[in-house]
Amino acid sequence: MAPRPPTATPQESVTFKDVAVNFTQEEWRHVGPAQRSLYRDVMLENYSHLVSLGYQVSKPEVIFKLEQGEEPWISERELQRPFCPDWKTRPDIKSWSSQQGVSEVSHSANVWSHATFGDIWGVNTQRHQESWRRHLGPEASSQKKITALEKIAEQNKFGEDSGLSTDLVPQLDVSSSIRPSECKTFGNNLEYNSELVTQSGIPAKKKPYKCDKCRKSFIHRSSLNKHEKIHKDDAYSNGTDQGVPSGRKHHECTDCGKTFLWRTQLTEHQRIHTGEKPFECNVCGKAFRHSSSLGQHENAHTGEKPYQCSLCGKAFQRSSSLVQHQRIHTGEKPYRCNLCGRSFRHSTSLTQHEVTHSGEKPFQCKECGKAFSRCSSLVQHERTHTGEKPFECSICGRAFGQSPSLYKHMRIHKRSKPYQSNNFSIAFEPNIPLTQGESVLTDVKSYHCIDCGKDFSHITDFTEHQRIHAGENSYDSEQALRQQSLSHPREKPYQCNVCGKAFKRSTSFIEHHRIHTGEKPYECNECGEAFSRLSSLTQHERTHTGEKPYECIDCGKAFSQSSSLIQHERTHTGEKPYECNECGRAFRKKTNLHDHQRIHTGEKPYACKECGKNFSRSSALTKHHRIHSRNKL
């Protein structure tokens, strides 16, 4: 068949689905490690060659997963074919599975070099064959034994050899002796043959290509190359230099020098430099660099969540989100800090943690040049320049730049007397305990997690939740933490055997116990002063650096401690959360309340060592000491 002229186009555009084979999660579990590696290499190679031939092939989800190292299975809904629950019990499948194994790499590679994953696992290969026949037209002949991708190369405008891998492409002359297997559940005919090599009409060939490592032989050089990768990967995992693939990443970015294994990866990477986003959402117009990102974004409009956790039933729009979620159940923390050994569930958590070692602050404000270690901190800071206040009080309409500031402001309404507004009034019944009255407003969830979008009413709950993303929770998994909190609702199960004080969390108990033992494991590198808490060391170090990261959004005054900022903000809001049970007087600081309560109790814990006089406040004792100092002069 003569090659088509350059202006000619195929009768029907080729899509990656014509050469791709997909798996469900159940099917993928039964594919061996060596076979998975072969599947990955061939799928990526075929996709790369289709793109290089000029076919407009958008990157499918399975290719994105393979490049990211994720499991490439797709949901049954995406596959749009019935899943056969009893496919594992079919005699032909069991016969094939019993003959396969990681140790028999040669046999499996040989079988797969002539067959498709669909032939072996029961995927409907008839659909692939029909689509190829459409591309080849009436000239297709079973006697020619030309594979589909070889025909694509023939249709190429210059007719040169495309180098496309035919390992995953169905042979057109499927032997009539292959008998379809019937699923007992659905009754569908699924083509399968456990002796595909000998029964498919493919003549027996010599195996001239031999592996130097294990002496296994192969018909095609490409099959030998794929087989040798198994030895390379094994050696690489054992830490030997011989296993490091040399020269495999030969596609280099001219802008930053980064290299890639596939040209398609380089093309996508270069979009970072060019800013190109060719994939646009038809609903909202948002554009993306990758087609897979567009597909995931479109799920946000449809609300579809095809990836479901088999343990708790929670569903996700992305497979990567499901993988991260499952680490909560398994307790897996694959991202480990090389400096301190701490492990994290998410790579982003590790990146944020590593900043604490390096002191790097990559996020810089374009207005004033101030730098931050986190992007979220920069966003909050930029609001001081723009004046943006997105968090608005639903009662009085006052707006704030940060959600914690709104929550602190809401306490004014919670603890105040009946509040009048132009639209409505709100009041707490005097005979109802304050905690019940507060419940009207505790539904306001002012603390928003930027990692997962979850909202919280209380900062303690929000802080505890963030530890899940950072990998800092003291429990092995979120499930264990939830069980612990359910078994001790409002209880304090951790009790000090020295003073009897009880705590809700083991971390608080450990920190408290250091008061009795005198242990101070956290030492300042500047002056050598030691502390029992890491937070105390962090606050102390700011006395050396002069850092004041906590800034008031109302007046711009900065503080080295968050507690100091909270107390300062009460001068703007007028909030006095600490109320005396005896007389009803309220205070901004808890220490002021304690000093005031001694008026009612008559307690005077501060005694003068000179004359023995007692005082209820430390400030009063300090003033009294001046009398003795003047007398000595």
Curated annotation (Swiss-Prot):
Keywords for this protein: DNA-binding, Isopeptide bond, Metal-binding, Nucleus, Repeat, Repressor, Transcription, Transcription regulation, Ubl conjugation, Zinc, Zinc-finger
KRAB domain boundaries: 14-85
GO molecular function terms listed in the Swiss-Prot or TrEMBL record: DNA binding; DNA-binding transcription factor activity, RNA polymerase II-specific; DNA-binding transcription repressor activity, RNA polymerase II-specific; RNA polymerase II transcription regulatory region sequence-specific DNA binding; zinc ion binding
Disulfide bonds: none
Keyword set includes Metal-binding: yes
CC annotations in GO: nucleus
Top-level lineage group: Eukaryota
Main localization of the protein described in the UniProt heading: nucleus
Residue(s) of cross-link: Glycyl lysine isopeptide (Lys-Gly) (interchain with G-Cter in SUMO2): K445
Record's subcellular location: Nucleus
Pfam families the UniProt entry points to: KRAB (PF01352), zf-C2H2 (PF00096)
InterPro entries the UniProt entry points to: KRAB, KRAB_dom_sf, Znf_C2H2_sf, Znf_C2H2_type
Ranges annotated as C2H2-type zinc finger: 209-231, 251-273, 279-301, 307-329, 335-357, 363-385, 391-413, 447-469, 494-516, 522-544, 550-572, 578-600, 606-628
GO biological process, one term: positive regulation of DNA-templated transcription
Protein family: Belongs to the krueppel C2H2-type zinc-finger protein family.
Functional summary from the UniProt entry: Inhibits the transcriptional repressor activity of REST by inhibiting its binding to DNA, thereby derepressing transcription of REST target genes.
Cited PANTHER family: ZINC FINGER AND SCAN DOMAIN-CONTAINING, ZINC FINGER PROTEIN ZFP2
Subunit text: Interacts (via N- and C-termini) with REST (via zinc-finger DNA-binding domain); the interaction inhibits REST repressor activity.
Designated name of the protein: Zinc finger protein 90
